UniProtKB/Swiss-Prot annotation:
This is Large ribosomal subunit protein uL16c. Belongs to the universal ribosomal protein uL16 family. Part of the 50S ribosomal subunit. It comes from the Eukaryota. HAMAP family: Ribosomal_uL16. Keywords: Chloroplast, Plastid, Ribonucleoprotein, Ribosomal protein. Pfam families: Ribosomal_L16.
């Protein structure tokens, strides 16, 4: 699973996800992509399970790029702990995803294979997604 090697600070604020993705919203490497349509935190486990589903379906054919990286730590307090006494310890890592962000890209396979592989990966994601090709990159983000 993905996680940063080292960070400047151990714990982050939760923040909020306003607006559309300003960066990472164009296809850069492949010919086909999976685009997010909703804002969400996507965990490193979800990213990895989507990647595995795509590689298994494509039978090691083509190349896959993961365009998101989980760089935000999510902290949790131990169960049945009293209020106060500080913030919990980091439990897992998430990638902050806004609508329009490209999650995965694919190249070297036919469109039908890419579409089917990305459909399987989309079932692993906690959000609605959209399959796009390099030609449709400028298409509006419509659910």
């Amino acid at each position: 699973m993905l996680s940063p090697r080292r960070t400047k600070f151990r714990k982050h604020h939760r923040g909020r996800m306003k607006g559309l993705a300003a960066r990472g919203n164009q296809i850069s490497f492949g010919d086909f992509a999976l685009r997010a349509l909703e804002p969400a935190w996507i965990t490193s486990r979800q990213i990895e399970s989507g990647r595995r589903a795509m590689t298994r379906y494509a039978k090691r054919g083509g190349k896959i790029w993961i365009r998101i990286f989980p760089d935000k730590p999510v902290t949790m307090r131990p169960a049945e702990t009293r209020m106060g006494s500080g913030k919990g310890s980091p439990e897992y890592w998430v990638a902050v995803v806004k609508p329009g962000k490209i999650l995965y890209e694919m190249k070297g396979v036919s469109e039908t294979v890419a579409r089917a592989a990305m459909r399987i990966a989309s079932y692993k994601m906690p959000i609605k997604t959209q399959f796009i090709t390099r030609i449709e990159t400028k298409a509006p983000i419509v659910e």
